[in-house]
Amino acid sequence: MRYSKNFDVIVVGGGHAGTEAALASARMGCDTLLITHSIENLGAMSCNPSIGGIGKGHLVKEIDAMGGAMAAATDEAGIQFRILNSSKGPAVRATRAQGDRVLYKAAIRRRLENQPNLSLFQAAVDDLLVKGDEVQGVVTQMGLEFMAKKVVLTAGTFLDGKIHVGLNNYAGGRAGDPAAVSLSARLKELKLPQGRLKTGTPPRIDGRTIDFSVMLEQPGDLDPVPVFSYLGRPEQHPKQVPCWISHTNEQTHDIIRGGLDRSPMYTGVIEGVGPRYCPSIEDKIHRFASRNSHQIFLEPEGLTTNEFYPNGISTSLPFDVQWELVRSIRGLESAVIVRPGYAIEYDFFDPRHLRHSLETKAIGGLYFAGQINGTTGYEEAAAQGMLAGINAGLAAQGKEAWLPKRSESYIGVLVDDLITRGVQEPYRMFTSRAEYRLSLREDNADMRLTAIGRDLGLVDDYRWEVFCRKQEAVSRETSRLKDIWVGPKHEIAPLVTQLLGQELSHECNLTELLRRPGITYEAITALGNRIWAPESLDDDLGLAAQISDQVEISVKYQGYIERQAVEIARQEHNETFPLPEGLDYSQVLGLSKEVQQKLNLHKPETLGQAGRISGVTPAALSLLLVHLKKGLGRTQETI
């Protein structure tokens, strides 16, 4: 049976990737259908009840800058907010929020149900409709066919998912949800290269059985209270609560070692590779054998539940071992587990076989986003989902894809890393992955991406108005700083001397003062109304802090940012220099066999991508350029 209506875009999956994909496509005016096996679980935080962190917070800000939902939903559901790396430079500062699971799901569902052009349907998708090498639609478990111009697949850990607790295992996409076995088999039939990965989650603990009096309290930031969205305000936050810190000990480690003979990871039952940067407690004990303690964060799961998430003891050990290891931790001696920890193994598909639009090369009109591409984390999934939704929508409208560059966004870094290098383990974003991170800060994601989002039809009138007011205010305040001069004989020179700790030797403007070490924008504005009489910083919109941060950072780091801009411009040539799709690299004279094999395997689309493949040297790129300029790189089809 075929559904009576055809769609522009169908999104399969209602997790963080799927919800952002569906919202993006619908905001662009595409008739969009989101199919999920459970409407109640739309936007569910399946593992850690938190959003953001180093690199991850940058992605959330970028999603928000383009009108996405994750940041705004977090502001409505966050029960603790912190700025990580607050004492370090602006490039690596990152927002993190502890979330209330119930409030977050409600915030996401509300946005989905009230988004024009977006329909929801509850069903499991078992099959894809493919004609030739183009996707036509999907088929649900009950045999109902939905037709669409484009399909975005965001299946998370559900593709042939298998849950492990000790040596027991069973099919499942996550605890309580079925695996997508038929859909995974169908994708394998289409000859899409795949592999297996693994992730895990810790046991959940009844907070009434935790002794917090012997733990270290970890409160959120209070002055100021952070927000995630550029349109967010602290007043939107629900009640704020602390997290708590404890540690494992030698007894804990002995218990874990004693259970390794029943660990699915250490007995070969699990074949999938787990995340390097979020290892299980078994992995920590094995890899860091010399350490006698590991930090554990007790994180509340919400305001209306007693459950706590013990961040740091993800495990797939048998339940009896989990019980013992939890009770060996200080403050958890009487703890009661309400949900056991487990590992989940699932299929992913090699992202090197995707285009930068996240469309599969093998099947036209089919887009992949999220853990299906080998990533880990809500934020990485949401960023890919938004990009896939954008490009599916653009393709449905007959328009060119939007391909974010590494130099303009962490989204661009994420996608380029996946497609150029592939994954051997679940991919997690860090600021260290971005070579231009000083230009890709949390504070300026809107300056980088909101205008692009507006052009794509993603940014509504209100967000655009707020952005324009902020942009104008930053420009106006920066100009004002340049226009105000202070000299050794100026009436407020003594105040400047006190501020600097030394006398002024020559006349300078306020931007020069602000560039001095230890001098802040706040200190400059406090010099006195006689030289500084700023207009309102749009505090009616809650923008004052954003504007002052932008002004201070852009002034203090101007020289570094300008040098980075020159470097970016220099790299643009390689980045956009196209490589013929059918180029046989074994015919390029002078390239080593290793480089030839890697280039033929990865099939980079541009010279810039080729240069980021491990083992491809600048000398190899020069040989490739010579080859192309001689015309030898043209394929039969392009001649």
From Swiss-Prot:
Keywords from the UniProt entry: Cytoplasm, FAD, Flavoprotein, NAD, tRNA processing
Cofactor needs: FAD
Pfam families according to UniProt: GIDA, GIDA_C_1st, SAM_GIDA_C
Positions contributing to NAD(+) binding: 274-288
GO MF annotations in UniProt: flavin adenine dinucleotide binding
Known partners and oligomeric status: Homodimer. Heterotetramer of two MnmE and two MnmG subunits.
Family designation: Belongs to the MnmG family.
Protein name according to UniProt: tRNA uridine 5-carboxymethylaminomethyl modification enzyme MnmG
The organism of origin for this protein: Polynucleobacter asymbioticus (strain DSM 18221 / CIP 109841 / QLW-P1DMWA-1) (Polynucleobacter necessarius subsp. asymbioticus)
